[in-house]
Amino acid sequence: METLSFEFPAGQPPRGRALVGCVGSGDLEVLIEPGLAGRLTINVQTSVNGAEQRWQHLFARMFDGTTPPAMAIDIHDFGATPGVVRLRLEQGFEEIGHD
């Protein structure tokens, strides 16, 4: 089990919160809450040791060149594929946009 932390530049915090997925369904749960202005923080608890570079590349592809809202994202992973991670994150972003 590893705990990883990532940070990216961001804009203003959203008003909404979201919880998508669950560890038993697709092996991934994502919790999204408003963060501190200017910072997007991501904490990942994963059962896959040695995968930090994979996570870093996934987040870089999603957030480089954009200004996402300032969010605090917690991910609980039990071996999800990068495609499932991206899907769950996009579902969460859609949910916070509905507030």
UniProtKB/Swiss-Prot annotation:
Q: Name one GO cellular component term.
A: cytoplasm
Q: Where O-(phosphoribosyl dephospho-coenzyme A)serine occurs, residue numbers?
A: 25
Q: Which UniProt keywords apply?
A: Cytoplasm, Phosphoprotein
Pfam families xref list: ACP
- Keyword Zinc: yes or no? no
Please name the GO terms that the record assigns under molecular function: acyl carrier activity
Asked whether the keyword Phosphoprotein is assigned, the reply is yes
- Tree of life domain: Bacteria
Posttranslational mods: Covalently binds the prosthetic group of malonate decarboxylase.
Q: Which HAMAP family is this protein grouped with? A: Malonate_deCO2ase_dsu
Family label: Belongs to the MdcC family.
Protein's UniProt name: Malonate decarboxylase acyl carrier protein
Q: Which organism is it from?
A: Pseudomonas fluorescens (strain Pf0-1)
Q: What is the lineage of its organism?
A: Bacteria, Pseudomonadati, Pseudomonadota, Gammaproteobacteria, Pseudomonadales
Question: Coding gene?
Answer: mdcC
